[in-house]
Amino acid sequence: AYYTENSDTFVSQGLDREGEKKIDVRHILIQPENGVKDDDGNTTYSEEDWEAARVKAQQILDDWLAGEATEDTFAEAAAANSVDSSASNGGLYSNVSQGDMTDEFDAWCFDDSRQTGDYGLVRTRYGYHVMFFSGLSWYNTAKSALLSQKSNNFVDNAIGQFEMTYDLNKLAIAGVQLGNATE
């Protein structure tokens, strides 16, 4: 209902649930080590290098599954383990269209049976990817916007119901006294 009521806003952001399917996915990239570069700058890896990368990726997946196994803990694992630039964002690729990624990555993401919360390993020319399917972009964005709106409404209502007073001279941020605000 929220998406429908605000569809113009979402469509203007490229998040049309009736249009092209766009997804959000998290991943942890584990690259093989000890590659050899040829004259063209292409790196090749031995089967032992690929197997070592697969074992490391599988161990990361197993460790994640042995814990809470939530999207948040996956994001933490991505930040700690991925060599991809998305690691700083918890391994998140958002608003991905089919064809944006390698064929193998795309095939996993856009499999018709893919459901929010699915996970797995995918091998591409870049290495092994520990995958987590976050869901359809339009849905995730609408859900986030709705939660933000409800949170803002809650705070606004709370502020309206209770009188608040404050002394700027005693204002502190994160435990640091700011002193006299008029100085």
Where are these regions (language model features)?
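Peptidyl-prolyl cis-trans isomerase
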Residues: 55, 59-104, 134-135
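PPIase-associated folding chaperone regions across multiple families
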Residues: 1-52, 79, 98-183
